[in-house]
Amino acid sequence: MKVGAVVITMGNRPEELRALLDSVAKQDGDPVEVVVVGNGAPVPEVPEGVRTVELPENLGIPGGRNVGIEAFGPGGGDVDILLFLDDDGLLARTDTAELCRRAFADDDELGIISFRIADPDTGETQRRHVPRLRASDPMRSSRVTTFLGGANAVRTRVLGQVGGLPDAFFYAHEETDLAWRALDAGWMIDYRSDMVLNHPTTAPSRHAVYHRMVARNRVWLARRNLPALLVPVYLGVWMALTLLRRPSRPALKAWFGGFREGWATPCGPRRPMRWRTVWRLTRLGRPPVI
């Protein structure tokens, strides 16, 4: 199976980007073709053979990754598998691409693989980087209902069938939107602890727009994908969880601003998942109300 990789960059981490690209080049088996997308910024110097696309403006994470997908033909169809990797990450092992090939070849239902993210210094995997509710053991691989945006592999047939990431989300929850559409189309998602991306431990709230976009996109996610009966339940649960976390006053103000924005602005096409998909998510351990 032919493997490609998409990396988006703001051009501000040239050393980390080079280390990532070197780790991709060291993968066992056939070479992985790489496209680096400069998301509103020039692409730093990259090794020979790495293709680059420079965008005149920042299209956000999903928009930038979608450009990278199309660089491999419509829906990424020039390759069988696409890796999506953060530009400050590093593939910890040289057999990751081969493990992906083997996993997809052995399981026709498998559409997406979420890698384990580990801190390069401590080896720690943050709880939020284990894409399931029972996240206490990051070394346990399992079927899951979503995936990590900057450390994953996607079978391109999934993208050809259900489309790419939602451009308008810009940042936050775009992976879950794609995951739900893939699951509704019959695909499965695996979390694999043996496929590791080393990545420094960070807090998502480091992004200035975090609280607003998390809330807005949560509303869009529900409006786009959930049966009407579940929309208020899902959003009510997440509002309660947000309040229980006792965010700062500015963060809470930004969150409620984003929540209102999610209702007041277009969310894109609405394609509610089937009830059997709701049941599938429930059996996988995460009903779409949390």
Give residue ranges: language-model regions.
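Short, acidic, metal-binding catalytic loop of nucleotide-sugar glycosyltransferases
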Residues: 22-31
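Glycine-rich, basic loop-to-helix element that forms the pyrophosphate-binding segment
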Residues: 55-74
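Short beta-strand-to-loop acidic/aromatic patch adjacent to the donor-nucleotide binding site
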Residues: 77-90
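A recurrent flexible, glycine/aromatic-enriched loop bordering the glycosyltransferase active site
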Residues: 119, 136-154, 176, 206
